[in-house]
């Protein structure tokens, strides 16, 4: 397993926000910034890179990125002694994250195009080169790693949240959360290998109700929220 000790981030109660809103309910935030490269992407990257290592033909990972994915991919590739290639849109990347990717030894390729153009390029490369693994969220193992947030929230609260709000880009992370909650609630859960599903903990999981998940997007880039195309 290729790990940088990701996960187990704190769930922090926002007492001041509750007071400001006059809320008669509890508000919590999951501090994913405490992951190794500063984002939830590390949860998925440990899975994606670990699975890539299982294929002896793969010696490189590749991603298109405007920020967090580039830093995470570069860090985990370095840990696994794999080469990392990052495709970035022209002038459209968070420089702090780009600096991380460079520091971890990734090869950076800037294109005259947007993120979607970059995604098309990396998919074509991976289709043509059997030694290259795509580690963007279209990689299903990324989603499997990121769903662990839901499990942690359930453990830390001791129950399901009633509502879960989170930002949405291409919807990979909100999908991962939903998969996690569905597994916890028993909608797609098989059984515990240790107790065959008979312990008190497993019983509480199987009867947990699904939360309402609400995604939100920045006003300048909200294609899912508005149904409009943004360049």
What are these regions (language model features)?
Residues 1-231:
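PLP-dependent amino-acid enzyme catalytic core
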């Amino acid at each position: 397993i290729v790990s940088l000790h990701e996960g187990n981030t704190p769930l922090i109660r926002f007492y001041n926000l509750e007071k400001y809103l006059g809320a008669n309910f509890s508000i919590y935030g999951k501090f994913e910034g405490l992951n190794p490269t500063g984002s939830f992407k590390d949860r998925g990257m440990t899975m994606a890179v670990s699975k890539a290592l299982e294929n002896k033909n793969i010696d490189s990972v590749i991603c298109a990125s405007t920020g967090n994915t580039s830093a995470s991919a570069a860090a985990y590739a370095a840990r696994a002694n794999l080469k990392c290639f990052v495709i970035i849109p022209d002038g459209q990347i968070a420089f702090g994250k780009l600096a991380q990717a460079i520091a971890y030894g990734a090869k950076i390729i800037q294109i005259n195009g947007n993120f979607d153009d970059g995604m098309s390029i990396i998919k074509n490369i991976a289709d043509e080169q059997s030694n290259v693994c795509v580690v963007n969220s279209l990689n299903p193992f990324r989603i499997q790693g990121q769903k662990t947030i839901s499990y942690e929230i359930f453990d830390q609260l001791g129950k399901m949240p009633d509502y879960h709000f989170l930002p949405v880009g291409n919807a990979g992370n909100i999908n991962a959360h939903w998969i996690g909650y569905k597994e916890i609630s028993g909608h797609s859960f098989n059984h515990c290998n240790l107790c065959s599903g008979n312990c008190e903990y497993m019983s509480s999981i199987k009867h947990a109700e699904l939360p309402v998940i609400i995604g939100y997007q920045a006003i300048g880039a909200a294609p899912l929220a508005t149904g409009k195309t943004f360049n």
